Amino acid sequence: MKLRTALLILMASALGASAQSSAVALDKAVAAVAAAKERTARDGRQTVFDIKAYLDNDGNLTVGGLTSDSLARKAVLAELNAAGVEFADSTAVYPYDSWALTRIPAASHRTRGAHAGEMATQSVMGTPLRVLEKGSEWWRVQTPDGYIAYVPSSSVVGLTDSEMAAWRRSKRFIVTSPFQIQVYRTSSATGLRDIVTDLVNGCIVTTVGGVPKVENGRLHIELPDGRTGYADAGHFTPIEEWAAQNFNPDRILDIAYSMEGTPYLWGGTSTKAIDCSGLAKVSYLANGIILMRDASQQALTGTRIEARDWRSCRPGDLLFFGNASTGRVTHVAIYDHDGNYVHSSGRVKRNSVDPDSPSYLTTPFLHAVRIAGNEETPGIVRARNHPWYFDIE
């Protein structure tokens, strides 16, 4: 009896020690995963990081889950190895083999897969998207600027890796008109019932049969979902020419000013309706430059110019506004000249950072950044160098 009791005590002690050891290992693993996330995936707007450490049913330490960034997964494994814990690796990276193109003039992307979800951004027709998850009604996608959100499956058309490669090599045109245009069923149609769709600045289409054909001044085009139609050829530019542009502040400001009076829309990223950072994105994209999505992200790019030095700003520089005590950026504008800028606040309009100007706004001006000369630095990408748009060797 005494021997049995002693054995039970020893077994309980061993189990307790094992449980304690597992708990310690789990704590180390949780800390390691958190450290990796802090280092490589702090911005959930751009990186999916659904990796967690846990004990399985047998009490074994497991680290599993998905991330959209291979560097984040490598960081997790490195942190775990540095912590000296033994674990089963069930982590994985979303593959780069599922793609989509936006099929409507402006698709709304939301923070969750529901129409009641907050609108995070938009993509215009022909925008290439990396597909992370497919549901029956919502797809989780990543836009070329890295932004991750959910888009209705009805707003996109899916492509395989080979189909996406073929699209990148196809004869494509981009809408460079600042104003909305109509696509008609025939080259001579003008009636309201003859409209296939509208297109906005930045929409990308292909040519029917792979060869540009113009009839009655209209280009015969194919939309991402296979629909065809005709639109005024003068509104299109071959995508290679658009992407080859040099920095042109006049082009950027022309697009921005063409939207004057356009209503503000949170998450709006098209000429239909637009928010402050969307105005910067759309205007720069017209010049072939892809900016980050949000003002707080854009504020960390380019060359910084202090607010007190606003007189040294040049046309096309971005101005950032927000909380003077915390430095938190909440608004962005595009600088023109002599303190004047264009921005979206309620509507697209003009104001000034010059305290002596009648159009001066009291919202604290924090700093500016210069995009010119900083292309291909973090957060600023020329479309011609983006592998989703072109085959980049």
Predicted regions and their residues:
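Short, basic/aromatic beta-hairpin or loop at an interaction surface
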Residues: 97-109, 170-185, 285-300
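Catalytic cysteine-centered active-site loop
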Residues: 264-278, 282-313
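SH3/SH3-like beta-barrel superfamily modules
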Residues: 60-62, 66, 73, 120-152, ...
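Glycine-rich catalytic cores of cysteine/serine-nucleophile enzymes that process amide/ester linkages
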Residues: 186-188, 194-199, 212-218, 261-274, ...
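Boundary regions of SH3-family modules and the immediately adjacent low-complexity/disordered segments
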Residues: 68, 74-97, 114, 143-181, ...
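Beta-loop motif signature
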Residues: 101-130, 176-207
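N-terminal targeting leaders
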Residues: 4, 8-9, 13, 19-127, ...
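Aromatic- and glycine-rich peptidoglycan recognition patches
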Residues: 158-167, 181, 189, 237, ...
